[in-house]
């Protein structure tokens, strides 16, 4: 079975300069390369091990044109590196994957690519590099040897996971597809209830552990919630957020906040109750409260996470900063803890249990 790692993430954008400026100015990414053809313009950005490609269509012939009309700016391609593109492509298509583009070599003779369908209209470009792994995406000119990324203690090291919203009823078939076509395995599964809302979630991961997809569908038997809202506003399945990992979430959030990134606010009651759930090992309660960073733990250790406020015109995609100190799960207890903390502040009750419905 083929092994996969993240090579780059491509987002389709309405305005290339505006989108690139935001990533460089607010998130401290650096421009690593550019690409242009008769139907598109692209910029490759780099920070840590993250390569982000932004593409603006210049012709209706480019698939970005139809994507943007339907969804607005968003993730269109999660490209994955593998040692044998032809074998991976053939196995995936044989197992039912949509064949988007057959394997072919680029002008860079050492690079072979192919493309298959993923979820919704998001695809996976498969990339085989016979040279160094630090090369630009195919078709780009420039240099990956950038020196100004990560400045100001932002330090986004890589991509921890993608959170993906699916239509109700599509979770099981999508999980089975990634297992069958790409050899992913399930590592986590849960049903989350938050008040009258509920969702089902399954996490699938490549054999190497380098590509992690958190797949989520709304529970048809519960009230509509944030997953339903995303599906409505995005007009279909798609990437809800990208989680960037950091060695120090508190420091990263301080640096990003100074650069103008807005994060979701956490009710003070959450921190009043946090000590009942967790004995903090890394960060102080005061630091977490000051930065709105959430904390959780599992049998492996602790994690610290925070979500940005969405700046998308449709309020769809947003981003996450996550620091793992041994934890292997995804902070699901924070969803319930935040809900109950909001209830405490809303009702003015002093006892945690009294806020439960």
Curated annotation (Swiss-Prot):
The pathway it acts in is: Antibiotic biosynthesis; vancomycin biosynthesis
Question: What's the stated role of this polypeptide?
Answer: Required to synthesize hydroxyphenylglycine, a recurring skeletal component of nonproteinogenic macrocyclic peptide antibiotics such as vancomycin. Catalyzes the conversion of p-hydroxyphenylpyruvate to p-hydroxymandelate. The decarboxylation and hydroxylation activities of HmaS show novel and distinct regioselectivity, compared to all other known p-hydroxyphenylpyruvate dioxygenases, by hydroxylating the benzylic position of the substrate instead of the phenyl ring.
Please give the CDD domains that the UniProt record associates with this protein. Answer: HPPD_C_like (cd07250), HPPD_N_like (cd08342)
Instruction: Name its species.
Output: Amycolatopsis orientalis (Nocardia orientalis)
This enzyme catalyses:
3-(4-hydroxyphenyl)pyruvate + O2 = (S)-4-hydroxymandelate + CO2
Q: Which residues does the annotation say bind Fe cation?
A: 161, 241, 320
Protein family membership: Belongs to the 4HPPD family.
Q: Which controlled-vocabulary keywords does the entry list?
A: Antibiotic biosynthesis, Iron, Metal-binding, Oxidoreductase, Repeat
**What biological-process GO terms show up in the record?**
tyrosine catabolic process; vancomycin biosynthetic process
What quaternary arrangement does the UniProt entry report?
A: Monomer.
Catalytic activity, EC: 1.13.11.46
Binding sites annotated in the UniProt record for substrate: 161, 201, 214, 241, 305
Broad enzyme group: oxidoreductase
Q: Does the keyword Oxidoreductase apply?
A: yes
Record domain VOC: where: 5-129, 158-309
Supply the name of the protein.
Answer: 4-hydroxymandelate synthase
How is the cofactor bound, in the record's words?
A: Binds 1 Fe cation per subunit.
Does the record's keyword annotation contain Lipid metabolism? no
State the needed cofactors, names only: Fe cation
What GO molecular-function term can you cite, just one?
A: 4-hydroxymandelate synthase activity
Specify one Pfam family.
Answer: Glyoxalase
Q: Which InterPro entries match?
A: 4OHPhenylPyrv_dOase, 4OHPhenylPyrv_dOase_C, 4OHPhenylPyrv_dOase_N, Glyas_Bleomycin-R_OHBP_Dase, Glyas_Fos-R_dOase_dom, VOC
């Amino acid at each position: 079975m083929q092994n996969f790692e993240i090579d780059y993430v491509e987002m389709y954008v309405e305005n290339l300069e505006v989108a690139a400026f935001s990533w460089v100015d607010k998130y401290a990414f650096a421009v690593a390369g550019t690409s242009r053809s008769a139907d598109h313009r692209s910029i490759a950005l780099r920070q840590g091990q993250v390569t982000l490609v932004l593409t603006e269509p210049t012709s209706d012939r480019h698939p970005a044109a139809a994507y943007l009309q339907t969804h607005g700016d968003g993730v269109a391609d999660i490209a994955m590196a593998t040692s044998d593109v032809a074998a991976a492509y053939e196995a995936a298509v044989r197992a039912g994957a949509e064949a988007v583009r057959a394997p072919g070599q680029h002008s860079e003779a050492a690079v072979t690519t192919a493309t298959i369908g993923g979820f919704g209209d998001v695809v996976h470009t498969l990339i085989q590099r016979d040279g160094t792994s630090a090369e630009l995406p195919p078709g780009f000119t420039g240099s990956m040897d950038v020196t100004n990324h990560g400045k100001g203690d932002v330090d986004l090291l890589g991509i921890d996971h993608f959170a993906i919203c699916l239509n109700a009823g599509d979770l099981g078939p999508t999980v089975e597809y990634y297992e069958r076509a790409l050899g992913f395995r399930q590592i986590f599964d849960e049903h989350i209830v938050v008040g009258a809302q509920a969702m089902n979630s399954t996490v699938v991961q490549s054999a190497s552990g380098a590509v992690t997809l958190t797949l989520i569908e709304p529970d048809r038997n519960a009230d509509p919630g944030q997953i339903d809202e995303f599906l409505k506003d995005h007009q279909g399945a798609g990437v809800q957020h990208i989680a960037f990992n950091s060695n120090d979430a508190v420091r990263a959030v301080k640096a990003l906040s100074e650069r103008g990134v807005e994060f979701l606010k956490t009710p003070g009651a959450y921190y009043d109750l946090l000590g009942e759930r967790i004995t903090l090992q890394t960060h102080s309660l005061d630091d977490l409260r000051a930065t709105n960073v959430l904390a959780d733990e599992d049998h492996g250790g602790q994690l610290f996470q925070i979500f940005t406020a969405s700046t998308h015109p449709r309020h769809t995609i947003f981003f996450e900063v996550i620091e793992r100190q041994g934890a292997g799960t995804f902070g699901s207890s924070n969803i319930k803890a935040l809900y109950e903390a909001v209830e405490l502040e809303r009702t003015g009750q002093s006892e945690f249990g009294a806020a439960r419905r």
